[in-house]
Amino acid sequence: MAKYGLQTSFLNEILIRYFGNGSPNIDINELYVGLGTTQTGADINMETFNELFDGKPLCNYQRARIIFNTPENGVISNGDEICFNTASEDWTTTTSKIEMLGIFRSADFDDKEPIVVISLPKPETVSKGETILLAKGVVQLSLTDI
């Protein structure tokens, strides 16, 4: 498959070098997934990505590490399940839901701008005592996402 005049093998190589997956001669990049909340009236994009929940940070919320598989047909996906902390309080409200995922180069919240943002198919809620698990292969990226 050629997309934008690029061969699939070249697309795969770009994805490996950008997201790194421990292939020979390629270091594994430390990448993390953050949860983005409702953005009324805003486009879902990097500039408006918001990890604050109902206007405040949560006491036990942390970004989760993600490791990508080797790209296939110009698409790269998470190779393992991604598990966030169990919520020690409600992470969402009736007006603030999880609508997107952001991929970051750091677990540190000083790194505010994600390298890519993915919209979820439907808004999700997380109540106290619940744990968000993202199944293997559910986070998929292609060059059109970056």
Predicted regions span which residues?
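Small cysteine-rich, disulfide-bonded extracellular modules of the LU/uPAR three-finger superfamily
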Residues: 1-101, 105-146
